[in-house]
Amino acid sequence: MSMFNKVVKEFQWGQHKVRLETGEVARQASGAVIVDVEDTVVLATVVGAKSAKPGQDFFPLTVDYLEKTYSAGKIPGGFFRREGRPSEHETLTSRLIDRPLRPLFPEGFYNEVQVVIHVLSVNPEIPADIPALIGASAALAVSGLPFNGPVGAARVAYIDNAYVLNPTRDQLKASSLDLVVAGTERAVLMVESEADQLSEEVMLGAVVFGHEQMQIAIDAIHELVRDGGKPEWDWQPAAKNEALIARVTELAQNDLLAAYQLRDKQARSAKLKEVYAATSAKLEEDALAAGTVAADKATVGNVLFDIEAKIVRSQILNGEPRIDGRDTRTVRPIEIRTGVLPRTHGSALFTRGETQALVVATLGTKGDEQIIDALEGEYRERFMLHYNMPPFATGETGRVGSPKRREIGHGRLAKRALVKCLPSADEFGYSIRVVSEITESNGSSSMASVCGGCLALMDAGVPMKAHVAGIAMGLILEGNKFAVLTDILGDEDHLGDMDFKVAGTEQGVTALQMDIKIQGITKEIMQVALAQAKEGRLHILGKMTSAVSGANTQLSEFAPRMITVKINPEKIRDVIGKGGSVIRALTEETGTTIDISDDGVVTIASTSSEGMAEAKKRIEQITAEIEVGQVYEGTVLKLLDFGAIVNLLPGKDGLLHISEIVNERVKDINDYLKEGQQVKVKVIQTDEKGRVRLSAKALLNEAAAAAQSDTPPQQ
């Protein structure tokens, strides 16, 4: 009899066979599930604390997705030969898993929960993110934790005008869409996508298709729970302190209403801080007078937050102006300036209301491309986009340093929005880095990065296929009433039910990201949000086109210029030289950057046209073939008893035999030649070993013969 109570569920999911199993591995975790999709295997585990920490006033959920190099049959690089800090891909996948899980935990559940997913085996054709998300959902479901799941997930491609479920990596290369959708049986919770200017109808269709197809996985998780799940936790939310709620409402409601009549963010924030402080102080006075203990500030803060949310949400649903005085469809005022930094390759300052991005584009060579060492194999990234948001952007102090998960996620979203509108490497051979520095933030800074990024690229002379703009939408949902908000503020994001970001061109959508803070939304709400987002996006595109009609035709004087030279691939080693000596000398002496591809295409880059021309000339000389009958102006390198070694081209020498110097007999070669002397010679013979024989007297004889016949001598 086995010591394991192993439960296995298998199902066919599109073109893939999926296997879920629990009960054998990681049995001391609250829940653990292994997911196997065509040899891509992940172990998802969940551990939940049995009680919340004292004074805990938020839900401490952490999700860690970890790729093990052994899963791809590799040994890690580096001195220690073990996995280090999470890669950008691991961080993004951790966020992808966190986003649909978080809203399904009940309000008031503050116990610490940790979800850890290990990638144990990788089929290069099957991405591990969807199995990881399914595994995390299943592990939570079997754990018995209070979780309103399970969650399903699916990747959707769009190939030849048809949706494809969970495509392979090869299929994704031919797809105009890469969309991940997650949700419950009833509704969609999360969308993350990159598209090639697709219509809103196609995007919505992909979301609906993915939601329909994920039901198979949700059903399988239900079966796994039925046969292998642990007992449900007996957890109940703490009873609400109605007396405290009533007293806080009495003390603060009117002041909070007044605060939300202030249109300026800084003034409103200052007023809210006053209200919070005054309310806490008054409650402490009440407690002192009654001889009781006052409620802690975290509890009071939660009550005040709930009152704020009710005020803002009811005003919007009742048709009243939003926090800053706008209606639900108006975009904040926009200001655009390009070329703001004198020595950068391209720059733009994009301001929308109280959100501002200073975006800089830098052009580089192939050597500047980012090398990604992924489980599926090494590849190069030609386009990089980095997003930074320092604390001063919101008028606060805080840590400055390496990017946080949020910054990495926002940078990836902006990159996805722009990448499909970049020219190909054949059209524009530069590597490109865009950096978005958020200098002010009051909502939708990632979409400001998209707009500013597009403008900075055009300022740098990158021939974009079209202008790209982004906009963030919000949602207020109460029962059957809902309002979709265009261009949300930070407070509206904080107090609302959805963050729905859409980027694209006039032609269509290039990126769509949706996060739901409630337990899902319907197709109708998504339809309204997409239509309203298109209206806002077109408005912003109009402003951008008015400011910058197209890409600059001239690159910045500080940007590198590039030329290419095609050489025989067999000559690559000659250009590189022993230990890189030749190419190193070339780059140092000409002030250029030189990249050589395996097919013999040499790319020379420099801010100096003279340096590029010199490097090109020298490369052509190095790779030139020595041909019999050719005449060269050579340099005497060395004198020997029987002749001289003459350098014809870089790395190409020949022997000028003593008998080939002049027609008369030469007794002492020093009477005719000196080391370093320039001498004109003709190639009279080459052999299979590359040895070259030269003659100077042949040219003398030709000149004499030409003089006799009045024919100009050969030059």
Curated annotation (Swiss-Prot):
Cofactors demanded by this protein: Mg(2+)
Residue positions binding Mg(2+): 493, 499
Statement: the UniProt record of this protein carries the keyword Iron-sulfur: no
GO biological process, one term: RNA processing
Gene Ontology terms: cellular component: cytosol
Every S1 motif domain range: 629-697
Main subcellular localisation: cytoplasm
Record-linked InterPro entries: ExoRNase_PH_dom1, ExoRNase_PH_dom2, ExoRNase_PH_dom2_sf, KH_dom, KH_dom_type_1, KH_dom_type_1_sf, NA-bd_OB-fold, PNPase
Top-level division of the source organism's lineage: Bacteria
EC number: 2.7.7.8
Domain KH, residue spans: 560-619
UniProt cross-references to PROSITE patterns, sorted A to Z: KH_TYPE_1, S1
Keyword Cytoplasm set for record: yes
Similarity section: Belongs to the polyribonucleotide nucleotidyltransferase family.
This protein's name: Polyribonucleotide nucleotidyltransferase
Organism: Burkholderia orbicola (strain MC0-3)
Gene: pnp
